Curated annotation (Swiss-Prot):
Pfam families in alphabetical order: Anticodon_2, tRNA-synt_1c
Cofactor binding: number and manner: Binds 1 zinc ion per subunit.
Similarity annotation: Belongs to the class-I aminoacyl-tRNA synthetase family. Glutamate--tRNA ligase type 1 subfamily.
Gene3D superfamilies with a match to the protein in the record: 1.10.10.350, HUPs
Domain of life: Bacteria
GO biological process: glutamyl-tRNA aminoacylation
Name of protein: Glutamate--tRNA ligase
GO terms under cellular component: cytosol
Subcellular location: Cytoplasm
Role according to the record: Catalyzes the attachment of glutamate to tRNA(Glu) in a two-step reaction: glutamate is first activated by ATP to form Glu-AMP and then transferred to the acceptor end of tRNA(Glu).
Length: 500
């Protein structure tokens, strides 16, 4: 298949969680296709039946949708497992052409002959003339001489002497093609012109380039993007590092912030600004500008990015974005978690993000109350999940209990101050400026400045020593509930001071 159009593919395996490295590769491929007016193909490489799970495939599609690579904007998904017949046909063709041979060597036999052979298989069956049969794998006949030169947009021209490349297996003894062959055959048949993938695949590239040549077709443009490392400069690991894209979604990272940050892992937009609209990224991204050196995944920087994106939302958008963390089983709102990568579909509409249920019952939540407090909270959260402990006092029947906070603040003049504050608040206009001035007056009678005077009031009403602006919070909570909590705190302090 050859159309003259740029055609890229993203080819994940559904054998585990979809991680940030896969997300970056998908975005890089997407932008190569978009920038050239070409095609993006989603190919699910699901040939490992023992490890594949349908939910992993669903997770890949959902994650791409969240990133803005939405169904309808690309070809696929194409499932590699459905192309087994074509892979077998290609393997048979290579055998018939003398470019591959059958090998009956077991691992034990190979080890007995070679020990720890530097270059792997020793070619024992190369000239034995074996045909297909039980226990026989098909190996590619690697050229004895010459050098395979890989033309890589990012890495230049790495060279691989052919005598260092073993006769590698291309089909198992059961006839199924291994990754190396299936990947090449699918790329060839789908007319893939650019292969953009992780650096870890570079070692496979000379073998695959030899297969492309054996199948009579020039190889695609290669581009191996840099490995992503943690703060210890170790390659990101699913077992060791926080890499699951879904965990970031559940924590409250916005798709736009995630896309922006992932694009910086190996590439940088022109100018000094790193936080830029995706349209700017799309217009300026070029594979030639990707750096080959390892890219550091800095979660603190990502968090800072996300805070900037949250603050850039309108209040209505912020309210909608917070909904999954405030209302049990709410879907991710499409209004905010919509496609970040050029707006090609419905974003996350209909996709439920697994976020913890809030600590209050659904009937206690008030959208009107949250809309009132949202402007106070928006500038104070870096991820959306932080909204829950910030506003929980508004929707719980009692202020959250923090005994350490209580012990720290409920001493000295706290009992008298809370008693007088409750009495004063019963009479004044319920306005945050009035509430503030009133507490200043109460505090002055006890020799306390406002910072000290408001500490026991905050703990009594919100359960915490820090939080949203206190007097605006009291205004939103309302006179009746504020007075009830202040009096409950007074009663507790009085009981402790005067036990029966």
């Amino acid at each position: 298949m050859s159309t003259g159009r740029v055609r890229v593919r993203f080819a994940p395996s559904p054998t585990g969680i979809f991680h940030v490295g896969g997300a970056r590769s998908a975005l890089f491929n997407w932008l190569v296709a978009k920038g050239a007016g070409g095609d993006f193909v989603l190919r699910v490489e699901d040939t490992d039946a023992s490890r594949n799970r349908p939910e992993w495939t669903e997770g890949i599609i959902s994650a791409l949708d969240w990133l803005g690579i939405s169904p309808g904007g690309y070809e696929g998904p194409v499932f590699q497992s459905e192309r087994a017949g074509r892979h077998a046909e290609a393997a048979a063709g290579l055998f018939a052409a003398g470019r591959a041979y059958y090998c009956g060597c077991t691992r034990d036999e190979l080890a007995a002959r070679t020990g720890n052979a530097q270059h792997g298989y020793d070619g024992f069956c190369r000239e034995r003339g074996l045909g297909p049969g039980p226990g026989r794998a098909l190996r590619f006949r690697t050229p004895d001489e010459g050098t395979t030169v890989v033309l890589d947009v990012i890495r230049g021209t790495p060279e691989f002497p052919n005598d260092t490349i073993e006769d590698f297996v291309i089909a198992r003894a059961d006839g199924s093609a291994v990754f190396l062959l299936a990947n090449v055959v699918d790329d060839l048949d789908m007319g893939i012109t650019h292969v953009v993938r992780g650096e870890e695949h570079l070692s496979n590239t000379p073998k695959q380039q030899l297969l492309w040549a054996a199948l009579g077709t020039p190889p695609p443009v290669w581009a191996h993007v840099p490995v992503i490392v943690n703060e210890k400069r170790q390659k990101l690991s699913k077992r060791r590092d926080k890499v699951a894209l879904e965990s970031y979604r559940a924590e409250g990272y916005l798709a736009a912030a995630m896309c922006n940050y992932l694009m910086l892992l190996g590439w940088a937009p022109p100018g000094d600004e790193e936080i830029v609209p995706f349209e700017t990224i799309e217009a300026s991204f070029r594979l030639e500008d990707v750096k080959p050196s390892p890219a550091f995944f800095d979660e603190k920087k990502l968090r800072a990015f996300n805070g900037e994106y949250i603050r850039a939302l309108s209040v209505d958008e912020f309210v909608a974005a917070c909904e999954p963390w405030l209302v049990p089983a709410a879907d991710v709102p499409a209004a905010v978690d919509a496609p970040a990568a050029a707006g090609t579909g419905d974003g996350a509409a209909g996709v439920t993000t697994a976020v913890p249920a809030p600590p209050w019952s659904p009937e206690r939540f008030s959208a009107e109350v949250f809309a009132a407090v949202a402007p106070l909270a928006q500038s104070r959260v870096a991820v959306l999940s932080e909204i829950v402990p910030m506003v929980d006092f508004l929707f719980l029947p009692e202020a959250p209990t923090d005994e350490a906070a209580w012990a720290k603040t409920m001493k000295g003049p706290a009992l008298d101050l809370l008693t007088e504050a409750a009495e004063a608040y019963e009479k004044v206009a319920w306005d945050h400026d009035v509430l503030r001035e009133t507490l200043i007056e109460v505090g002055e009678r006890h020799g306390l400045k406002l910072g000290k005077a408001q500490a026991p009031v905050r703990v009594a009403v919100t359960g915490r020593t820090v939080g949203l602006p206190l007097f605006e919070s009291l205004e939103i909570l309302g006179r009746e509930e504020t007075l009830r909590r202040l009096r409950a705190a007074v009663e507790r302090l009085d009981t402790a001071a005067n036990p029966a």
